[in-house]
């Protein structure tokens, strides 16, 4: 995802 951003999950892919 964004590498550390709360997009849809807290771990941030």
Swiss-Prot record:
Gene Ontology process terms (BP): envenomation resulting in negative regulation of voltage-gated potassium channel activity in another organism
GO cellular component terms, A-Z: extracellular region
Keywords: Amidation, Ion channel impairing toxin, Neurotoxin, Potassium channel impairing toxin, Secreted, Toxin
Top-level lineage group: Eukaryota
Tissues in which the UniProt entry reports expression: Expressed by the venom duct.
Presence of the UniProt keyword Transmembrane in the record: no
Compartments where located: Secreted
Disulfide bridge positions per record: none
Known function: Inhibits non-inactivating voltage-gated potassium channels in rat dorsal root ganglion neurons.
Official protein name in the record: Kappa-conotoxin Mo1659
């Amino acid at each position: 995802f964004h590498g550390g951003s709360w997009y849809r999950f807290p771990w941030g892919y």
